[in-house]
From Swiss-Prot:
It holds the Pfam family Ribosomal_L23. This is Large ribosomal subunit protein uL23. GO terms for molecular function: rRNA binding; structural constituent of ribosome. Keywords: Ribonucleoprotein, Ribosomal protein, RNA-binding, rRNA-binding. It comes from the Bacteria. Signal peptide: none annotated. Belongs to the universal ribosomal protein uL23 family. The keyword Ribonucleoprotein applies. The keyword Lyase does not apply. GO terms for cellular component: ribonucleoprotein complex; ribosome. GO terms for biological process: translation. It comes from Chlorobium phaeobacteroides (strain DSM 266 / SMG 266 / 2430). Part of the 50S ribosomal subunit. Contacts protein L29, and trigger factor when it is bound to the ribosome.
Length: 103
């Protein structure tokens, strides 16, 4: 697989995971597996990945009421990966580089 990483998933919950546990959340391709994700993060950011957990998220169904009737559709399914790094390592999302922690 070329690059399974799509983008960092920056939410209030994922930011809390980063601050408290040193875990980072990424949106990844649906067909990506844990080993591909681990290799991609280690190559791109130059860090040591301790573990990878993945979550398959189902897309929501949507309805729109119009004069001609009800239009039904569905948002796309997606997948996110929760990545735990080795101690004293971090990822800077904006520059694509890593920083060593003090301690």
């Amino acid at each position: 697989m070329k690059n399974p990483l799509l983008r960092p998933w920056l939410t209030e919950k994922s930011t809390g995971l980063t601050e408290k546990k040193g875990q980072y959340v990424f949106k990844v391709k649906l067909d990506a597996d844990k080993t591909d994700i681990k290799k991609a993060i280690e190559e791109k950011f130059g860090v040591v990945v301790k573990s990878v957990r993945t979550v398959n998220c189902l897309g929501k169904s949507k309805r729109q009421f119009t004069r001609k009737g009800v239009l039904q559709g569905k948002k796309s399914d997606w997948k996110k990966a929760i990545v735990t790094l080795a101690k004293d390592q971090s990822i800077d999302y904006y520059s694509g580089s890593t920083q060593k922690g003090e301690g």
